[in-house]
């Protein structure tokens, strides 16, 4: 059955990877069994000799990655330390906790009260994100101490800690690796608003905020210059929302290789190897400051979404990824 047929009729909440797993099972002759009343949140994949269970949400769809490697990658600060030790250029940064709970187990210098001093060391401008966040939630530029305070107030409702990093500007790419081999690379682009000739940028942002909220993703209206808010976009005109480029937050991707692809791919490979990941999506900057050879890893994803491949009609790459997973846990022979 084509992947598009499996997608048809699924509820919007049904996990993408559950659909892809069923598609791969049909292709490779394995048994797929959904075990949560049709939600797709839990399922098993079985061969003639064994069965393996998978779960959505915080569950991993990449069993070839060890729990140690995957959880290390999920902590953006610790992952950065490990990569830096291996000689991988990263964005650096420091972490700060937002609540008093568990303070007895933490080293000094990383509480909310300490964030202001570090922020000033960065020139009172930084890129902020939750320490263990995903999908671009609360990932944004903070440009003043007042904005930092407001940001920490809001993010503390949902997360325990944040990472503050110096600002870098460049072209952003995602490199997807399986056992060190590049499966694909794609350039990431920021989200855009499309004018209707009637609505102001502020009004279009309100609609965007509402759509993001339904998916549990923060908005970034504070990152928009107030001078633009009342401007009415002509019909069809596109206006870039500054900041994050995650597809889940309205960004886009297209297949592309960096200008210095060999160097970029080598950087991604060193990052994955440093963390011990067999499957990983490495997000990196190239062309930093206009220098095409300047590159740094942004972060490493051990449980990345692959919806981009479905939307691009690359069912073959989805199957390659799931075959790699099935082989790694003994459901298929090499």
Language-model segments: residues:
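Residue-level "edge-of-site" marker
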Residues: 37-39, 96, 132, 285
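A short glycine-rich, hydrophobically flanked beta-strand micro-motif that places a catalytic Asp/Glu
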Residues: 36, 162-166, 173, 277-290
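Extended, charge-rich helix/loop segments that form flexible
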Residues: 203-252
């Amino acid at each position: 059955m084509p992947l598009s047929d499996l997608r048809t009729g699924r509820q919007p909440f049904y996990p993408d990877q559950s659909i892809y797993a069923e598609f791969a099972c049909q292709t490779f002759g394995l048994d797929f069994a959904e075990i949560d009343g049709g939600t797709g949140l839990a399922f098993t994949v079985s061969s003639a000799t064994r069965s393996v269970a998978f779960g959505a949400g915080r569950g991993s769809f990449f069993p070839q990655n060890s729990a140690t490697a995957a959880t290390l990658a999920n902590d953006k600060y610790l992952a950065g330390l490990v990569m830096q030790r291996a000689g991988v250029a990263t964005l650096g940064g420091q972490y700060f906790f937002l609540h008093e709970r568990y303070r007895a187990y933490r080293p000094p210098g990383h509480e909310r009260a300490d964030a202001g001093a570090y922020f000033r060391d960065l020139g009172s401008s930084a890129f902020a994100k939750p320490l263990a966040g995903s999908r671009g939630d609360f990932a944004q530029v903070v440009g003043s101490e007042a904005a930092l305070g407001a940001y920490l107030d809001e993010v503390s409702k949902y997360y325990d800690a944040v990472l503050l990093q110096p600002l870098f500007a460049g072209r952003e790419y995602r490199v997807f690796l399986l056992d060190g081999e590049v499966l694909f690379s794609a350039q990431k682009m920021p989200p855009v608003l499309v004018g209707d000739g009637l609505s102001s940028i502020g009004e279009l942002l309100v609609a965007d905020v509402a759509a993001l909220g339904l998916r549990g993703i923060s908005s970034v209206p504070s990152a928009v210059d107030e001078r633009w808010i009342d401007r009415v976009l002509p019909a069809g005109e596109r206006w870039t929302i500054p900041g994050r480029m995650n597809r889940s937050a309205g960004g886009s991707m297209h297949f592309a290789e960096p200008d210095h692809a060999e160097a970029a791919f080598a950087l991604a490979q060193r990052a994955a190897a440093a963390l011990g990941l067999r499957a990983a999506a490495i997000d990196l900057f190239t062309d930093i400051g206009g220098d095409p050879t300047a590159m740094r890893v942004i972060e490493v994803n051990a449980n990345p979404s692959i919806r981009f491949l479905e939307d691009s009609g690359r069912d073959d790459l989805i199957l390659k990824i799931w075959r790699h997973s099935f082989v790694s846990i003994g459901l298929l022979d090499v």
